[in-house]
């Protein structure tokens, strides 16, 4: 733990928020079409309809905001899952929640011809909730009850199954294959503010709720018996935490597709900075997750310019070595 005093944690958090704002501004400025900081300022103060101004306001700004919200949502969901399951490798991606949400979106589009953003968000929520329930039930089977290793294995099985089913549906409808495949790799390109505003209320509500649960989560992590002895309603708390995970992961997948590794690695960085106090781990995870995804999106524009790498590929490149390190180190919550 780097920051031991509350004052130092506040200072670091404010600095991280400033870094996030800087990264968002950089995301609006830099890309294939050359623009300057001056043009960005003019686009918001004296918009004149030029190509650069349109790109800044209608393409890059929504993209930066989407990356911010999605990164914060996935990181906070990962921190909640690691506390809920007592598994340092837990995340919406590893437990199959992202894959389940993605499958329900593709299935809804294929069978029910769902097109509206609101319907896509609810399809994603339904898939995330269904997958979470199945993984939890499968992980609870056997004499030992719920264990981290069984949860991980059940999640991996569900992720593989839903990924296979999704690919099967896409192979039948080849006309939409290219666009949907780009979405399934995880991307914030081409997302509109209207789509963001459709999912933002759910993600914002879940973030606010989980921030207020920090102290209760601290007691739960100490042990369920300890939490019950201190008057904690552990069943209700777990339900609310699971609901927040579904809302955060479901809304993120609905707008950006299944982006992996943010939910795994970011909570560990947050705990490295502020320790195991979830009053701080959750907000730090949200800000760090937003920073990572915004910066990864900027990098994705330059690797094979003029083409773009899906940001999900960038997070996988960054996250895989960290994931292996965490697994070998046997990180503790």
Curated annotation (Swiss-Prot):
Q: What happens without the gene?
A: Strains lacking this gene show a reduction in growth stimulation by the iron-hydroxamate siderophores schizokinen and arthrobactin compared to wild-type.
Subcellular location(s) per record: Cell membrane
Which GO terms of type biological process are on file?
A: siderophore-dependent iron import into cell
Specify the signal sequence span: 1-31
What membrane topology does the annotation report for this chain?
Multi-pass membrane protein
Cite the GO molecular-function annotations of the record.
Answer: transmembrane transporter activity
Q: Which residues cross the membrane?
A: 64-84, 94-114, 119-139, 152-172, 193-213, 246-266, 280-300, 303-323
Q: Which UniProt keywords apply?
A: Cell membrane, Ion transport, Iron, Iron transport, Membrane, Signal, Transmembrane, Transmembrane helix, Transport
Name any GO cellular component annotation.
plasma membrane
- Quote any Pfam family the record assigns: FecCD
Function (record text): Part of the ABC transporter complex YfiYZ/YfhA/YusV involved in import of the iron-hydroxamate siderophores schizokinen, arthrobactin and corprogen.
Q: What is this protein called?
A: Probable siderophore transport system permease protein YfiZ
Q: Which organism is it from?
A: Bacillus subtilis (strain 168)
């Amino acid at each position: 733990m780097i920051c031991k005093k509350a004052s130092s944690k506040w200072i670091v958090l404010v600095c991280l928020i400033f870094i996030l704002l800087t990264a968002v501004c950089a995301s609006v400025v830099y890309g294939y079409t050359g623009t300057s900081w001056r043009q960005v300022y003019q686009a918001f103060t004296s918009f004149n309809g030029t190509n650069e101004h349109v790109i800044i306001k209608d393409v890059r700004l929504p993209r930066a905001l989407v990356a911010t919200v999605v990164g914060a949502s996935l990181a906070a969901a990962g921190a909640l899952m690691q506390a809920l399951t007592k598994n340092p490798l837990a995340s919406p991606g590893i437990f199959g929640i992202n894959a389940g949400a993605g499958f329900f979106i593709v299935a809804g589009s294929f069978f029910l011809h769902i097109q509206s953003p609101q319907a896509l968000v609810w399809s994603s929520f339904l898939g995330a909730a269904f997958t979470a329930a199945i993984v939890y039930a499968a992980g609870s089977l056997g004499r030992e009850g719920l264990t981290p290793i069984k949860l991980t294995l059940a999640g991996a099985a569900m992720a593989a199954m839903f990924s296979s089913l999704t690919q099967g549906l896409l192979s039948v409808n080849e006309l939409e294959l290219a666009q949907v495949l780009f979405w399934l790799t995880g991307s914030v390109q081409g997302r509109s503010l209207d789509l963001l505003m459709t999912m933002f209320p759910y993600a914002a509500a879940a973030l606010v709720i989980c921030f207020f649960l920090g102290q209760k989560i601290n007691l739960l992590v100490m042990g369920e018996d300890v939490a019950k002895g201190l008057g904690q309603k552990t069943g209700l708390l777990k339900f609310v935490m699971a609901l927040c995970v579904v809302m955060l992961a479901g809304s993120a997948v609905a707008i950006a597709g299944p982006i992996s590794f943010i939910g795994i690695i970011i909570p560990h960085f947050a705990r490295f900075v502020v320790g195991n106090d979830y009053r701080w781990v959750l907000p730090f995870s949200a800000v760090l997750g937003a920073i990572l995804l915004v910066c990864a999106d900027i990098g994705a524009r330059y690797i094979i310019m003029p083409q773009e790498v899906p940001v999900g590929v960038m997070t996988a490149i960054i996250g895989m070595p960290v994931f292996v390190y965490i697994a070998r180190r046997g990180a503790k919550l």
